[in-house]
Regions:
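N-terminal binding-site loop/beta-alpha segment at the start of enzyme catalytic domains
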Residues: 1-92
Length: 92
């Protein structure tokens, strides 16, 4: 059984943003600090892209990312996935 996604108004922008968002920190992977990996590891880009695509299928259009997540790698992976989905203009 699939439940319909709930959307909320985003201020006065006219945007309808999914009530549930997807955090993208883990998609950035580990970064090197003092020669040691730090952060999330164990997920590859293909798994990340598949996860993002599934989130979009389920109605998620709100993604939390930062240039600090894998020194920008999370944003690159998110951009790639949304480009493949083909509706980047409706994602926030």
């Amino acid at each position: 059984m699939q439940v319909a996604m709930v959307y909320r108004a985003f201020g006065k922008t006219g945007w309808r943003v999914s009530q549930i968002g997807l955090g993208c920190w883990q998609f950035g992977g580990a970064i090197m600090l003092d020669g040691q990996p730090d952060g999330w590891s164990g997920i590859n880009d293909e798994e990340s892209v598949a996860t993002i695509k599934r989130a979009v299928e389920l109605g998620i259009n709100f993604f939390d990312t930062s240039d600090m997540y894998g020194w920008g790698h999370s944003e690159e992976v998110l951009g790639r996935a949304l480009k493949e989905v083909g509706n980047r203009d409706r994602q926030y």
